[in-house]
């Protein structure tokens, strides 16, 4: 009831005031206060305060008269003490007088003082007046403070109030019902209570609370409620800060409460869950838990086991929620998890009446964070009504109470989610509510079950909204809850064992059909959600069983599918409501990667970060695995059994059963993998995959997941890193089919691939049509409409999917072997897990081979798809999935692969839901459809970046071109373009698989570049990771891009900032698109930011290099974009694109003159300009792009700076204090700087390489998306956290290396420099990357750099210049030019100018200027430190030295560019090393060295060529990595670059192998302190061990 939080927040000052108030308020009748407070809490916060004042005045008069002052004094003392302790505060509040505390603590706290004095003034004795006056004064102070805090706490407070009110009501209902249900004695009261009690319970419960508050209920309920209130607020306060770890705290109360046998076991569940959830329940997050608990309670009431199950749902949900809170962006995610658990309980319980309904309610509650907290479906009918509707209308809830959760659900479904659903998702309920529709259609019981799902969906959606929820949920769901997950399973196994068995039996019954009819029926069912309807009991049971296991994967799949996916997914990262598993969303919701993980976790949302998730997940897995075995079909894919796998298995079964993206979307996306990988991509996938990704992720996930399934642990994990995790999971879902395909693709089943492609193309075309339909409407953003569309399209989708599934199944039959055989590729695919192992290469290469092979045939598409298949599963997934996802949206590219996923459904759902519930993600409709898909593709992993890029490329292009119907068209266009791109790039792809593709198809480029990266062997590794990160980046950027595209880009960005999660996705989309644009099609506008991005992903990198270089020359554009962009390209592309502009021009132009121009534009964005130089061709489009990009850049730069300023990054750092913070901090700085760059630098970002770009871009773009990135960052970072060492290295590498991305700002060069590629390879080598952890280093270094850069800023700009992107970013053409005059000249001039200028130059300069200066300074410092630290890595050192020299030279020579000849080399070195350093600094110093060498070569070559140089330099770094980088670098010299690229690729391999050979000893000469002067660097270069000439070696 109490806001509790306010006093808690104000506890110190209010303690006294509250004590006084409490005397008065305690005098007030608690009943009145409780009732009124409940009502008031329902009212607006301010209104509540006013009402509280009036009411409290009245009550104060009454209470004062009624109560004794002595008691008041005693209570004051106690309450003061207790208030200081929120938990006690709740209890005393209950005993002392909830009203008093409520009034005092609640909004009333501040207002009460006024009221208190007023009432007392009238009725108070004179002796009391002084107290009243003091209170008045004090309260006025409090009021003022509250006025300040209200905005902050308003949401939390309202949520808390509503949730607590609902919670109180629900708790009492549940409490009573729990007694009734559990006791079964009071079962009769259940229905009456729900209906009557809803109102009566509010009154009675309030009264009872008032009475019981003094008595057991007062202790139990109040303890639960108040504590939950207190906890909730504290949770809000603490949790977000404390992060996931606090999860246990919030959980503790639940556990404590559960431990406390307040009433009966049911009460424990109810009371506990309620208390636990109650705490959460009060808050939205609490409600989620509450509802989750409601579900638990209901379920619990039904069975203790269900309690556990309920616990499970609640816990998981909470975690997700918390993760979200940690992410701050996705409260929904947590909710989602809770819902899932609740759902599971309800479903498992099989008691449709109360139990089933209850579960849903919880979900709903969570969905609403605020509103639904309670009921949303009110775990019980009561909960539903109370919680779900409670928010909207208690009356309806009352009516629906019997309906139970379902009724709420029904309302939610119909109402759009009575309280919460409507609220959070608005469409969520709608989403699930829409989903709920089936529940409505279903019998009440089924509804209850479904309702739970729907509620789950709702929860997911909602969570996004309630920030507090996240905290509270997290708390609750954080640790203990997750264990609850096993409990859920355990309970399931024990108590609900029979029910569960029944469910399993039902599943078995359905499994044959699902598995056999898996394509058609399940699809129909799932898609339509009719599936739920159609097989409501079975489906629900299956879902429930799955949910229990899968975390509602199936059920969520359903509800989640439309629902969760829909907006929630889109909206809330975790919203993957589609995830419904809650996890995906949760994880997604966990907006942070962890949140995704959480969502994933479903699995303990954040728990991802938390081990419990893994351990628990394993438990679940074991349990689920058993269940699955029991279930029969479920066992279908034992592989998955990793933490995720159980879910995946279930999902796989579900996939078989439902194959709809929904499950994938819900579970896969959210669940296991994210859970597993939250650290990695888990967050990402969820971030990406989460909502938006859902679709793509599903597609890619489907595509990827099969592989993941095959290599569930490794592959999944890797997926995790990428958006892939969720995506993978989803892909798993579809992938069972597609996996086969993809596996086959991986296996080089050209025939199958072709068939698949053909079928997929057909399907995708259908999908396109459908998506277009959906997207257009969705673009409309009408959630309901989305539902309709979903339904309408779903049938189409179903048909298509059925067809696809049938085809796929057929193919699967054909290819089923291939999944296993693919396991080899998958093993390669493991590259995700073990990117280094060429896994990407293994996968991708095979994929590439396949792609290359297919290139001829399906050519680009297949390559992408294949890459998708092969790569797709991995980061490349992007290549594949990327192709897929983008293809999914752009399905034609992705067609074959994407088709497999048919995230399209997901996309559709996502789109619809995202469109409908979309945050600001308007794209969600179209974009999110794609974004979902794309995001997921991205999520898929880096590949998804590619995907993003490609997809969004097309989408963005289309969206940009066709904002309204964009998505539909976009997919096509993009597909077409990507297609064309592929064709054009196809060759590139062939080379850089990704590259060629990428080239033409930015998306593919990136995808394939991702592949390339993967293929890049050395870079590959990094790339995988990079990609993952890229994915995040992309997502964010995509979202931005998407958002931007769809709406006013600025607005979207703002929105993005607002809906960072969505924004992140959008940004990612935007980037992806930008990348795609860079690739070309989209190049125009949107791409600006993306430019850097997308392509940036230098995925192309390694391969890119070779390819980029080789293809790069020709396909280079693609490579550039793609390869170079990709990674190498990134740099190269970035630089190459941007820098590579020159290169781009050459390569880009070569690649696709048109695309090139676009790509250049894109890349150019920076590159474009760069390109401009290159083929003037780019310029024209580039110029247009320039303006657009500049505008974009400026907007982004603005955002970035703001974000910089805002320190968006910092919060994410909070996410994982350590690594995450460092990374985030670095990312922030980088992003801030780089971010600016990323976006502005996008060119840079691209430079940064897609990796960097992706990364850097991610952050860089993120900078633009900083807001998005903030969350994303967290997510990505957390992933990097786990991956930190490996991935972090990569991450950092990406960041640091590609991260130029971060650096990207200036780092672009950095990242761009080989950042991506380097990052890729570096990643492996990067371990020094750990120094990247020092990313803090880079940060610290950067700062120092900043100082240096400050002085040398102009030069620095030049310095950034090295990062063509940098230059881009740093924008000052001079910057680029300055630095690498050589580069700068062409690149700098064109590239830089264009890059900087084009990309950033206008915007860049403004954008970067601050950022560049800061970034660069940081960079310089970083580099210095890194040099010092990474003296190992000569490259970086050299880079620094070179940079330093270069800077000095630049300063000295001024143009420095003129230094070209010798300085050119120096500059090349500098550039190279600067870029590389920047790029490599953190990323591979080795590669950087190598890259440096190569880079130098190329750069020198490029330098020779000039323009290429700049890009080349970075490119060269990329070259090494990027190979493409070479391309990029080569970009300047595409020819030499190409040769160089080839040699560089070799060199990279050799160098990377020998990278240690580069003596970094010279760095040893450098003063260790970061203050060492440039001269020191230069002097250090004099070291005999270090010869620039050594770097010159080809």
From Swiss-Prot:
It is found in: Nucleus; Chromosome. Keywords: Chromosome, Developmental protein, Differentiation, Neurogenesis, Nucleus, Repeat. May have a regulatory function possibly in association with the Notch gene product. Residues 175-192, 462-477 have a biased composition (Basic and acidic residues). GO terms for biological process: apposition of dorsal and ventral imaginal disc-derived wing surfaces; asymmetric cell division; CENP-A containing chromatin assembly; chromosome segregation; follicle cell of egg chamber development; germ-line stem cell population maintenance; heart morphogenesis; imaginal disc-derived wing margin morphogenesis. Sequence repeats lie at residues 986-987, 988-989, 990-991, 992-993, 994-995, 1091-1092, 1093-1094, 1095-1096, 1097-1098, 1099-1100, 1101-1102, 1103-1104, 1105-1106, 1236-1237, 1238-1239, 1241-1242, 1243-1244, 1245-1246, 1247-1248, 1250-1251. Pfam families: MamL-1. Residues 94-111, 353-381, 402-436, 575-604, 981-1001, 1164-1177, 1362-1377, 1390-1400, 1504-1533 have a biased composition (Gly residues). The keyword Nucleus applies. It comes from Drosophila melanogaster (Fruit fly). It comes from the Eukaryota. Residues 1092-1107 are annotated as: 8 X 2 AA tandem repeats of V-G. Residues 79-127, 175-308, 346-443, 462-496, 569-731, 752-920, 950-1060, 1162-1183, 1362-1438, 1486-1537 are annotated as: Disordered. GO terms for cellular component: chromatin; chromosome, centromeric region; CSL-Notch-Mastermind transcription factor complex; nuclear speck; nucleus; polytene chromosome; polytene chromosome puff. The keyword Repeat applies. This is Neurogenic protein mastermind. Residues 218-232, 817-827 have a biased composition (Polar residues). The protein has many AA homomeric domains: 21 poly-Gln runs (from 5 to 16 AA in length), 4 poly-Gly (6 to 10 AA), 3 poly-Asn (3 X 5 AA), 1 poly-Ala (10 AA) and 1 poly-Thr (5 AA) runs. GO terms for molecular function: transcription coactivator activity. Gene3D superfamilies: 6.10.250.970. Residues 1237-1252 are annotated as: 7 X 2 AA tandem repeats of G-V.
């Amino acid at each position: 009831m109490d806001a509790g939080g306010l006093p808690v927040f104000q506890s110190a000052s209010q303690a006294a005031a509250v004590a006084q108030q409490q005397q008065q308020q305690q005098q007030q009748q608690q009943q009145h206060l409780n009732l009124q407070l409940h009502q008031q809490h329902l009212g607006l916060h301010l209104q509540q305060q006013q009402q509280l004042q009036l009411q409290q005045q009245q009550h104060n008069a009454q209470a004062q008269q009624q109560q004794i002052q002595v008691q008041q004094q005693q209570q004051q003392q106690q309450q003061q003490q207790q208030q200081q302790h929120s938990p006690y505060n709740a209890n005393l509040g209950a005993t002392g007088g909830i009203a008093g505390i409520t009034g005092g603590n609640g909004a009333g706290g501040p207002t009460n003082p006024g009221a208190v004095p007023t009432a007392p003034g009238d009725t108070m004795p004179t002796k009391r007046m002084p107290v009243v006056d003091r209170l008045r004064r004090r309260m006025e102070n409090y009021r003022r403070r509250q006025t300040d805090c209200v905005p902050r706490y308003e949401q939390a407070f309202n949520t808390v109030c509503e949730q607590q009110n609902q919670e109180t009501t629900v708790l009492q209902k549940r409490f009573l019902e729990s007694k009734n249900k559990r006791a079964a004695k009071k079962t009769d009261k259940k229905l009456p209570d729900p209906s009557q009690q809803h109102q009566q319970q509010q009154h009675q419960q309030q009264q009872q609370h008032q009475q019981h508050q003094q008595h057991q209920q007062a202790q139990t309920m109040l303890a639960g409620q108040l504590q939950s209130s207190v906890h909730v607020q504290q949770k809000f306060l603490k949790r977000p800060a404390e992060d996931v770890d606090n999860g246990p705290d919030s959980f503790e109360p639940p556990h404590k409460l559960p431990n406390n046998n307040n009433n009966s076991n049911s009460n424990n569940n109810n009371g506990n869950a309620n208390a636990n959830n109650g705490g959460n329940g009060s808050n939205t997050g609490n409600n989620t838990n509450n509802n989750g608990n409601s579900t638990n309670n209901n379920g619990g009431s039904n069975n203790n086991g269900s309690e556990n199950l309920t616990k499970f749902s609640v816990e998981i949900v909470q975690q997700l929620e918390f993760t979200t809170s940690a992410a701050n962006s996705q409260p929904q995610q947590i909710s989602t998890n809770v819902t899932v658990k609740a759902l599971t309980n309800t479903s498992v319980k099989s008691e449709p009446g109360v139990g089933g309904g209850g579960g849903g309610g919880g979900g709903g509650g969570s969905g609403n964070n605020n509103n639904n907290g309670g009921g949303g479906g009110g775990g019980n009918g009561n909960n539903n009504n109370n919680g779900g509707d409670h928010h909207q209308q208690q009356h309806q809830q009352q009516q629906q109470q019997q309906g139970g959760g379902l009724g709420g659900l029904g309302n939610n479904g119909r109402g759009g989610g009575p309280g919460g659903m409507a609220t959070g998702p608005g469409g969520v309920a709608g989403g699930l509510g829409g989903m709920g529709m089936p529940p409505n259609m279903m019998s009440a019981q089924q509804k209850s079950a479904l309702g739970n799902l729907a509620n789950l969906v709702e929860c997911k959606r909602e969570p996004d909204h309630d920030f507090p929820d996240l905290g509270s949920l997290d708390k609750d769901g954080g640790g203990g809850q997750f264990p609850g997950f096993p409990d859920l399973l355990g309970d399931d196994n024990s108590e609900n064992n029979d029910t569960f068995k029944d469910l399993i039996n039902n599943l078995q019954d359905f499994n044959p059909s699902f598995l056999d009819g898996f394509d058609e029926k399940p699809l129909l069912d799932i898609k339509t959600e009719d599936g739920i309807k159609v097989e409501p009991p079975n489906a629900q049971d299956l879902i429930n069983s799955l949910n229990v296991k899968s975390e509602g994967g199936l059920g969520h799949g359903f509800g989640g599918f439309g629902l969760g996916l829909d907006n929630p997914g889109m909206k809330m990262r975790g919203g993957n409501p589609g995830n419904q598993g809650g996890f995906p969303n949760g994880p997604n919701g966990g907006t942070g990667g962890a949140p995704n993980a959480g969502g994933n976790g479903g699995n303990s949302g954040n728990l991802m970060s938390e081990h419990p998730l893994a351990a628990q997940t394993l438990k679940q897995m074991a349990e689920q695995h058993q269940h699955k075995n029991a279930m029969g079909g479920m066992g279908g894919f034992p592989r998955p059994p990793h933490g995720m796998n159980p879910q995946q298995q279930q999902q796989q079964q579900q996939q078989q059963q439902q194959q709809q993206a929904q499950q994938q979307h819900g579970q896969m996306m959210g669940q296991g993998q994210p859970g597993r990988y939250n650290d990695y991509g888990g967050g990402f996938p969820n971030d990406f995959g989460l909502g938006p990704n859902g679709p793509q992720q599903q597609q890619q996930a489907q595509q990827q997941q099969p592989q993941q399934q095959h290599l569930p642990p490794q592959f999944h994990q890797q997926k995790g890193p990428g958006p892939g995790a969720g995506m993978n999971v989803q892909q798993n879902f579809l992938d069972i089919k597609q996996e086969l395909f993809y596996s086959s693709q991986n296996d080089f089943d050209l025939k199958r691939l072709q068939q698949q492609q053909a079928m997929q193309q057909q399907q995708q075309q259908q999908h396109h049509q459908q998506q277009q339909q959906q997207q257009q409407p969705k673009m409309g953003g009408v959630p309901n409409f989305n539902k309709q569309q979903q339904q309408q399209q779903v049938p189409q989708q179903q048909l298509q999917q059925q067809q696809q599934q049938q085809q796929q199944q057929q193919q699967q039959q054909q290819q089923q072997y291939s999944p296993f055989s693919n396991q080899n590729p998958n093993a390669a695919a493991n590259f995700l897990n073990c990117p280094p192992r060429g896994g990407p290469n293994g996968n991708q290469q095979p994929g590439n081979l396949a792609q290359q092979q297919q290139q001829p045939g399906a050519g680009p598409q297949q390559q992408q798809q294949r890459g998708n298949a092969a790569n797709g599963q991995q980061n490349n997934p992007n290549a594949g999935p990327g192709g897929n996802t983008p293809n999914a949206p752009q399905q034609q590219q992705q067609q074959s692969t994407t088709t497999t996923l048919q995230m399209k459904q997901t996309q559709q759902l996502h789109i619809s839901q995202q469109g409908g519930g979309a945050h600001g993600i308007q794209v969600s409709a179209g974009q999110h459809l794609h974004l979902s898909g794309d995001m997921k593709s991205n999520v898929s992993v880096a590949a998804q970046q590619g995907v993003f890029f490609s997809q969004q490329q097309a989408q963005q292009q289309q969206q940009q071109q066709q904002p309204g119907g964009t998505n539909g068209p976009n997919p096509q266009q993009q597909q077409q373009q990507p297609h064309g791109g592929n064709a054009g790039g196809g060759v590139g792809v062939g080379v850089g698989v990704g590259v060629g593709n990428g080239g033409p198809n930015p998306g593919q480029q990136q995808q394939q570049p991702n592949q390339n990266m993967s293929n890049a062997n050395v870079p590959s590794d990094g790339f995988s990771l990079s990609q993952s990160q890229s994915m995040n980046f992309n997502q964010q950027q995509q979202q931005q891009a998407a958002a931007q595209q769809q709406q006013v880009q600025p607005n979207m960005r703002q929105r993005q900032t607002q809906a960072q999660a969505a924004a992140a996705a959008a940004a990612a989309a935007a980037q992806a698109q930008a990348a795609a644009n860079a690739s070309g099609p989209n190049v125009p506008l949107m791409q600006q930011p993306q430019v850097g991005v997308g392509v940036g992903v230098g995925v192309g990198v390694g391969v890119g290099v070779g390819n980029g270089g080789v293809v790069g020359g020709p396909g280079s554009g693609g490579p550039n974009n793609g390869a170079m962009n990709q990674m190498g390209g990134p740099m190269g592309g970035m630089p190459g694109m941007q820098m590579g502009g020159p290169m781009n021009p050459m390569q880009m132009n070569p690649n696709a003159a048109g695309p090139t121009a676009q790509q250049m534009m894109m890349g150019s964005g920076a590159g474009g300009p760069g390109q401009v130089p290159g083929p003037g061709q780019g310029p024209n489009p580039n110029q247009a792009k320039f303006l657009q990009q500049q505008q974009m850049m400026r907007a982004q730069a603005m955002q970035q700076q703001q974000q910089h300023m805002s320190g968006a990054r910092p919060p994410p750092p909070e996410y994982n204090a350590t690594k995450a913070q460092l990374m985030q901090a670095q990312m922030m700085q980088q992003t801030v700087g780089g971010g600016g760059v990323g976006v502005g630098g996008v060119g840079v970002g691209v430079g940064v390489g897609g990796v960097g770009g992706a990364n850097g871009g991610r952050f860089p773009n993120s900078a633009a998306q900083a807001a998005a990135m903030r969350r994303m960052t967290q997510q990505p970072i957390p992933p990097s956290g786990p991956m930190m060492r490996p991935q972090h290295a990569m991450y950092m590498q990406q960041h640091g290396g590609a991260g130029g991305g971060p650096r990207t700002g200036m780092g672009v060069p950095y990242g761009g420099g080989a950042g991506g590629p380097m990052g890729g390879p570096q990643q492996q080598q990067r371990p020094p990357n750990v120094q990247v952890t020092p990313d803090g280093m880079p940060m610290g270094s950067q700062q120092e750099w900043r100082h240096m850069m400050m002085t040398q800023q102009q030069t620095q700009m030049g310095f950034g210049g090295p990062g063509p992107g940098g230059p881009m970013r740093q924008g000052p053409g001079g910057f680029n030019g300055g630095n690498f005059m050589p580069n700068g000249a062409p690149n700098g001039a064109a590239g830089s100018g264009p890059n900087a200028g084009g990309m950033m130059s206008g915007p860049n300069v403004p954008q970067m200027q601050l950022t560049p200066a800061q970034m660069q300074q940081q960079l310089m410092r970083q580099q210095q430190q890194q040099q010092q630290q990474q003296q190992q890595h000569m490259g970086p050192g050299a880079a620094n030295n070179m940079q330093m020299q270069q800077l000095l030279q630049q300063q000295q020579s001024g143009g420095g560019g003129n230094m070209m000849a010798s300085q050119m080399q120096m500059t090349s070195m500098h550039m190279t090393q600067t870029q590389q350093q920047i790029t490599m600094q953190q990323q591979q110093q080795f590669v950087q060295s190598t890259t440096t060498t190569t880079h130098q070569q190329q750069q020198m070559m490029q330098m020779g060529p000039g323009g290429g140089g700049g890009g080349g330099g970075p490119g060269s770094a990329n070259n090494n990595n990027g190979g493409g980088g070479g391309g990029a670098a080569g970009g300047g010299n595409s020819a030499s670059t190409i040769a160089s690229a080839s040699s560089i690729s070799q060199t990279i391999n050799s160098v990377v192998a020998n990278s240690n050979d580069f003596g970094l000893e010279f760095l040893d000469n450098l003063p260790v302190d970061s203050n060492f002067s440039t001269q020191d660097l230069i002097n250090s270069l004099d070291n005999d061990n270090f010869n620039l000439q050594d770097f010159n070696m080809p």
